[in-house]
């Protein structure tokens, strides 16, 4: 995913945590906050060291990024932070995709109906 789609600064993460709204399921927590200047979404991913070693954490992050890449044109322009919870570490990429799509639908972050 291009740099324009990323949230990197700690201050940006903290602002979204403080002022954003959250939606969660068993595997993921989504924090979202609208931003007037955005023409597309921005994504930040957080996977705790408690979830496993670097290989496991990076696999989860890759699966999350891939899901957002697939739905890049379907997303509303928002700042989004995805936090992976413990059950996500034992899931396949397809299961991660389904779970993430579910929580994104609940958060109403799609600009059109996704099957």
Curated annotation (Swiss-Prot):
Keywords: Endonuclease, Hydrolase, Nuclease, RNA-binding, tRNA processing. It comes from Staphylococcus carnosus (strain TM300). RNaseP catalyzes the removal of the 5'-leader sequence from pre-tRNA to produce the mature 5'-terminus. It can also cleave other RNA substrates such as 4.5S RNA. The protein component plays an auxiliary but essential role in vivo by binding to the 5'-leader sequence and broadening the substrate specificity of the ribozyme. InterPro entries: Ribosomal_Su5_D2-typ_SF, Ribsml_uS5_D2-typ_fold_subgr, RNase_P, RNase_P_CS. Consists of a catalytic RNA component (M1 or rnpB) and a protein subunit. PROSITE patterns: RIBONUCLEASE_P. Belongs to the RnpA family. GO terms for molecular function: 3'-tRNA processing endoribonuclease activity; ribonuclease P activity; tRNA binding. GO terms for biological process: tRNA 5'-leader removal. This is Ribonuclease P protein component. Its EC number is 3.1.26.5. It holds the Pfam family Ribonuclease_P. GO terms for cellular component: ribonuclease P complex. It comes from the Bacteria. It catalyses: Endonucleolytic cleavage of RNA, removing 5'-extranucleotides from tRNA precursor.
